[in-house]
């Protein structure tokens, strides 16, 4: 995989979009008492996330949509995300399993949504995907106050 954003995006406080392949993952933990690091092997990316967030709710991105950045969402605020519209299975999973409502950008601009609900804004991005990136990895992270 190119980088972490292509397989994992945090979309709310304890919610993650994830492409969780069957591959084991080696992680390394470093701290002051162990500056050389400690290798920890996990069976999957989902296991890694659950280890560090015991309240994690994982929304799966199918392999077919991983290539089109189905797990690469931009969270503009907790529970408010942008995702390529072509990732229909991922969006369906978010609406059925996560209580998200899917909108087109025009609906958001026109104020056709409830600000208290979790939303996924379906963006076209057909030209952006040619650069092999999704909404999250094509932006600069911001620190929110």
Stretches with model-predicted labels:
Residues 1-145:
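Histidine/cysteine-enriched polar flanking segments
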